[in-house]
């Protein structure tokens, strides 16, 4: 389901790019897809058990236990991905994340993230457990991207070809 968007993301990157996967979870299916397409990954997740799975499954890649909100790796990447992770932060933390994206971006860095379709907060469920979701509105995401030096390349709300995800693809100027 994500392959078409991941291909768009990869299409904007140089070959054998470095990619920062923020909120990588277990690495399936996103990290696997990117690694199979030649990317050198640095995955970050706040859950040690998720990073342990990544280290076992993708030993050639770099994995870090860290809170995305305070992430400071002191280096930049060709690509930054926050797929199905960023929207679990409250609105104020999402606003702050744009400085984190900017700190890890070089000229031409490609950023892709998922959000909700409109401003609001909701509690969903995942594997029977409550799961928090939040979103800013589209105009605010655009303003934050612009302020952080990113230009929107593509934005689709509730993409029917991608599980109704709302997707943002941008490039650092």
Annotate each PLM feature.
Residues 1-17:
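Conserved alpha-helix/loop element of class I SAM-dependent methyltransferases that forms part
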Residues 81-82:
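A conserved beta-strand element that flanks and buttresses the S-adenosyl-L-methionine
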Residues 95-107:
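A short glycine-rich, Lys/Arg-flanked "PGG" loop and its adjoining helix->strand segment in the class I
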Residues 20, 26-70:
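Class I SAM-dependent methyltransferase SAM/SAH-binding core
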Residues 157-173:
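Core SAM-dependent methyltransferase catalytic element
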Residues 108-115:
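Conserved beta-strand signature within the Rossmann-like core of class I S-adenosyl-L-methionine
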Residues 124-139:
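Acceptor-substrate binding/catalytic loop of class I
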Residues 116-121:
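Short "lid" loop at the C-terminus of a central beta-strand within the Rossmann-like core
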């Amino acid at each position: 389901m994500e392959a078409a968007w991941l291909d768009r993301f990869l299409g904007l990157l140089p070959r054998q790019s470095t990619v920062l996967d923020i909120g990588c979870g277990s690495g399936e299916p996103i990290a696997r897809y990117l690694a199979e397409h030649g990317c050198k990954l640095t995955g970050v997740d706040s859950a040690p058990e998720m990073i342990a799975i990544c280290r076992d499954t993708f030993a050639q890649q770099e994995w870090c236990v860290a809170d995305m909100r305070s992430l400071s790796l002191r280096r930049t990447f060709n690509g930054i991905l926050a797929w199905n992770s960023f929207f679990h932060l409250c609105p104020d933390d999402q606003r702050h994340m744009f400085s984190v994206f900017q700190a890890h971006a070089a000229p031409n860095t490609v950023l892709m993230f998922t959000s909700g379709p409109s401003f609001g907060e909701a509690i969903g469920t995942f594997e029977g457990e409550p799961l928090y979701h939040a979103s800013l509105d589209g105009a605010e995401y655009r303003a934050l991207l612009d302020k952080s030096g990113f230009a929107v390349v593509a934005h689709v709300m509730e993409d029917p070809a991608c599980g109704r995800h709302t997707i943002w693809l941008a490039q650092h100027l």
